[in-house]
Design a protein with these regions (language model features):
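Proteins enriched for Cys/Gly/acidic motifs involved in redox and nucleic-acid/cofactor modification
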Residues: 1-202, 240, 255, 277-288, ...
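Conserved SAM/AdoMet-binding glycine-rich loop
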Residues: 75-79, 84, 186-309, 319
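Terminal RNA-binding accessory module
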Residues: 341-439
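Structural recognition of alpha->loop->beta junctions
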Residues: 91-106, 213-224, 247-254, 313-325, ...
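Short glycine-enriched, charge-decorated loop/helix-capping segments at active-site entrances
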Residues: 47-48, 166-167, 206-209, 268-274, ...
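Conserved, mostly hydrophobic/aromatic
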Residues: 157, 177, 194, 229, ...
Length: 439
């Protein structure tokens, strides 16, 4: 059977897609990149916010067009959208031949068999259960890969549906994480990107204490060059974790700490732990302890209780803290969440206007950061040659894949993807940096 996978949404979802691909490969199925010509197209969806839901529906409809044209036989939809809208998908999208929830990725092979036998699989398992340990088919370039260390979330932010889609927080056993990490390192992965919905909480459910620092020290013993950290909850930083990040050379001084907002009233209404003073203290502590630190965060504008004063406070906070990278999203009420029932709403157009203003603030901060790098030499991991820019493209410690842009550079000889090279920064191009090989 020829199977094509389409993965939407976050890197955590991508890991699930890669696991399903490995299960299909091991069962003897043929994996193909393009949907056209496949027996089955598997679409692993995101259903977190409105834009993600729209992308998922558009992707399903595009696959349905291929099916109508006889280029695809069956469509199987998995992931967060199906977990959230099981009945609606079955009823309103008759083109979909089967669905699976977020607790059922391990059932992909029997689901495909049921599908091709004429059935309409509808497989949903316990989303709070133990994490299945499966091999993966890496879809990222061979020099970097994601390492997911936990599933689910216990933070219960008032605006977020993730706990209802992914279940309670479950850490993977450290020995399982390290076994997978060794396989990645042995396969030639140079940059290991540690992810979960909240990696700072790692270990508390299994071992009764936070274990991220201990895990990082073990990962540093493996043959990775870089270890990058994503999704750290701000009030769970221990001194041990900060010291480990500062002292371990392989752990990059790049931290993705989603804060969403800084106003105390908004944070409390959204069931976010901590307050503005604690955020300021944390960022000062991190900057003082970790040289060259680059911060990334996520921000939401237009949350309930965000009046004009709270929004101005957020703008001033960002100008004070100077967070180098940020993803900015206008709030969209998600059915089934406490925030969706709150009365202190901000108009959708106003939320979008505020998001645009925050993007402007962050653009100026990023420009200042880029200006500070001019003339300096930085280590760059080459991602390959970009035929459009006619330059090599890569990333320094300050750029995470897909979300932070790249550094484009010239060289008088071939630079291989996965090679680390020194690059002198000489300019900027549409917010991204340009440079030249500094050998």
């Amino acid at each position: 059977m020829k199977v094509s996978f389409i993965s939407l949404g976050c890197a955590k979802n991508l890991v699930n897609t890669e696991q399903m691909m490995a299960l299909c490969r091991d069962a003897g199925h043929t994996l193909q990149e393009e949907p056209a010509g496949a027996d089955v197209v598997v679409i692993n969806t995101c259903g977190f916010i409105d834009s993600a839901k729209e992308e998922a529906i558009d992707t399903i409809l595009a696959a349905a067009e291929l099916k109508a044209a006889g280029q695809v036989q069956k469509i199987l939809v998995t992931g967060c959208l199906t977990q959230r809208y099981q009945q609606e998908i079955l009823t309103e999208l008759p083109e979909v031949d089967g669905i699976m929830g977020t607790g059922s990725y391990g059932e992909i092979v029997p689901a495909l068999a049921e599908l091709m036998a004429g059935g309409r699989p509808c497989r949903f398992a316990d989303i709070h259960g133990m994490i299945d340990e499966f091999d993966r088919v890496l879809t990222t370039p061979g020099h970097y890969a994601y390492l997911r260390i936990a599933e689910g979330c216990d933070n219960r932010c008032a605006y977020c549906v993730i706990p209802s889609l992914r279940g309670r927080y479950r850490s993977r056993r450290m020995e399982d994480v390290l076994a997978e990490a060794r396989r990645l390192a042995d396969a030639g992965v140079k940059e290991c990107i540690v992810i979960a919905q909240d990696i700072t909480r790692y270990g508390i459910d299994l071992y009764g204490e936070w274990k991220l620092a201990a895990l990082l020290r073990e990962l540093c013993k493996l043959d990775f060059h870089w270890i990058r950290l994503h999704y750290l909850y701000p009030d769970e930083f221990t001194d041990e974790l900060i010291d480990t990040i500062a002292d371990e050379e392989k752990v990059l001084p790049y931290l993705d700490i989603p804060i969403q907002h800084c106003n105390d009233k908004v944070l409390k209404a959204m069931n976010r732990r901590g307050d503005k003073a604690e955020l300021l203290a944390l960022f000062r502590k991190l900057r003082g302890r970790i040289p060259g630190l680059v911060l990334r965060t996520s921000l939401i504008t237009g949350l309930p209780y965000e009046d004009e004063a709270a929004f101005e406070e957020l703008c001033e906070f960002l100008q004070e803290v100077r967070i180098e990278r940020a993803g900015v999203f206008p709030y969209s009420p998600e059915e089934g969440t406490p925030a969706a029932k709150m009365l202190n709403r901000v108009d959708t157009d106003e939320a979008e206007r505020r998001a645009d203003l925050i993007v402007d603030v962050q653009s100026r901060i990023m420009d200042d950061f880029n200006d500070s790098r001019m003339g300096g030499v930085t280590e760059v991991l080459c991602d390959g040659f970009d035929s459009q820019a006619m330059m090599f493209a890569g990333r320094s410690y300050a750029e995470s894949p897909d979300i932070d842009g790249r550094i484009y550079f010239t060289a008088d000889h071939e630079v291989e993807a996965g090679e680390f090279v020194p690059v002198r920064i000489t300019g900027a191009m549409d917010g991204e940096l340009t440079g030249e090989l500094a050998e």
